């Protein structure tokens, strides 16, 4: 990587922030939390929660503490509903922020600290965790009040932190096999670092994206027929929007939750403005089965008798690719299985491909100067 970006490339080597010692520490800490908590509140916004949420909401283990999300809204209605969920539950909270000036996590952390102190008294500090950078005001709070402090890597931007304390602790609390996740990332790292350009899937994806961009396609839709990817889309959208969207350049990332949204945006994709190209995530291994049993009542769906919903879903997927590819470019990324290992592979693949895509486009993949514009006016209005 370029020397000027070196302070943002701590994610390139997965081992740097997810070696055996770090994983062991996180597993032991998560085990302690799981033994004492009904719910774990993840306070964070954007890169501080998207990676963890994408895996937790897809793979959370039955019986694991509920993961409740805070610090991602300023809506009093949403915040009150979140606080209502805490009633009667044994709680731990983790405030995750690289920049503790961000309003959403900062304000949520205050009301949740106050709740913890009211609920647990002098024992509250044992249940409060903060994940921040060394020397930050968040670390100062931990030192002063006895909260547990975890390091947010200074050399990793928020949207690249899946394989660090930021993403791994909440996942481990939810019962995710973080070793399998990290191994998936390591295996993908080895693959995309060692393969030649003509065989390198990350390089091919980055090049194709830029080729379509140059041909006038300004929107990329990441689509799948698996609802478990719902929050992974949010992570992916932030990754590409913040990394590429600058200097009046960039491909606008959106998601297609199929088959449901074939009945809404499907019309635009098929017949609307030709501005979209599509990338499909296709899970190749069947994890579950549900057979449509015959029914003596005539409902005109007898053609489904004996068919597995896996087969039906795949038929819808293949038909969609066939139809859409007649109008727009369609790529497919095959995902071996919906499990922690393959989520790890996806994280590293997209991070590395995004980095390459930004290099081709000629923008810095690791800054986000545009997000400061609204903050100036907001802080002025609030009297900061």
What residue ranges belong to the model's regions?
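Active-site phosphate/pyrophosphate-binding segments
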Residues: 119-278, 367-384
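A short, well-structured juxtamembrane/interface segment
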Residues: 17-34, 199-211
